[in-house]
Structures are given as C-alpha cells and as structure tokens.
Amino acid sequence: MGPDGKLYFNVGAPGNIVMPSYQQASISRVDPQTGVIETYATGVRNSVGFDWHPQTRDLWFTNHARDWVNDEMPHDTLHRAAKKGMNFGYPFCHQGDFPDPEFGKGRSCAEFDAPAAKLGAHIAPLGMRFYTGKMFPADYRNNMFIAMHGSWNRSTKQGYNVVRVNVDKKGKVWMYPFLDGFLTDPKGDPPMWGRPVDVLQMPDGALLVSDDYNGIIYRISYKK
C-alpha cells in the first residue's frame, strides 16, 4: 500500500525481450475505494521489490534487465519513480544507456528515464525495504536494504548478498555491502550456499532476511 492509500503492483514482461501489451512491463496502482486501476510507470521489465522513501515518499524499485546479451550487459537496476508517467525504457533501452540489440534500433536511450543506479549484470535484485528502525546505527535510518538473489546465466557468478543503499533527496545513490558470504566459488556448481530473497524490518528494528536455497529466515540484530 502506497502513502497515497492506493495498492501498487508490478506486471512483468511475458518473456525475456518482447514488446509488452497493455499493462505488461509496468507498475500499476488500484484505488481500493473505487476499484480504478491506472498505470503508474512503464518500461519496467520485472520489478520484484519496491518501497517508498520515508521522507520524500518517492517510489523506489528494483528491476531485472533482459538476459542473453553477454556476461556483463545489461545491468539490473535501481529506480526512483518520483511521479506518475515515467518510462524506464524496456524493451528499447536497458540500464539507461544500452540500446537493446533487437528493439533498440532507431531509438535513443535519451527518450527514457534513466535508473538511479546500476546494480550489476544478472545480479537479480529481489526484495527491498527502507529502514526506519532504531536498533541499527543512526546513519542506517532511511537507507534501503536490497536482497540480491544472484546470477544464474553468467559464467562468473555474482550477487548472493544483501546491500545497504543510501540515497539523498536528489536521488544520488551510495551502495555498501551489508550481508555477504553466501557466494563461495563464482565458477563453481553450485557457486553459493545461500540465496537472499527478501528483507523485512521487525518492530524492534532487527532485520529479517529470507533464503530460498536453504529454506531459512535469518534475523540480523545490532548491539554496540
């Protein structure tokens, strides 16, 4: 539920790289009082996690880019949708500056809204939450945590971690490692022993992290 009292949801693209039809590759919202549905943002291939900044109330979301270009391109991304009607490029442009080899011909990435940050190629960002608790240090307040599920179609695997992201009022991004250690052998099979999926803040300020590889929920707390 957004700060405007409307329920937001993502409808992903129906394939790796296709021309989306009505409401596909978008974030939409529905007014529970009237049942009216409207598209809020387009050009979003597949957003699994989104949340609103506690101070600015801007919508932030993660996005999965297309596969099968190469190991390093394109990056999965983090976006800020500060207003209705923004278009983030799919299927014509990825990561703000990479025209799609198939659909990008004759189009410019300058036509679309750029991401706030590139997160890494095939890194699979899933759940994300802004932190509003008081257990962690004060400089964690209003930061977001993003669960990186990790790559599967990349020769050298990456991700499999949780990162902390600080953003300012203009949307500038700083990213820091928070929970690491799941990735043990980037070229191994399997390369990891855990895969973060989502993050959730508890009433006491602790953080829960789910791991669908082991079927475990971890609780992360802080003490001075």
Language model regions located:
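Hydrophobic, small-residue-rich alpha-helical packing segments that form membrane-like cores
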Residues: M1-L7, R29
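C-terminal substrate/ligand-recognition segments
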Residues: L200-Y213
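Beta-sheet entry/capping signal
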Residues: K6, D58-L59, A206, I216
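Loop/turn residues immediately N-terminal
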Residues: R66, N214-G215
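Glycine-rich beta-to-alpha transition loops that act as phosphate-gripper elements at the mouths
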Residues: A41-G43
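Beta-propeller domain segments
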Residues: A13-V18, Y22, S28-G35, R45-N46, ...
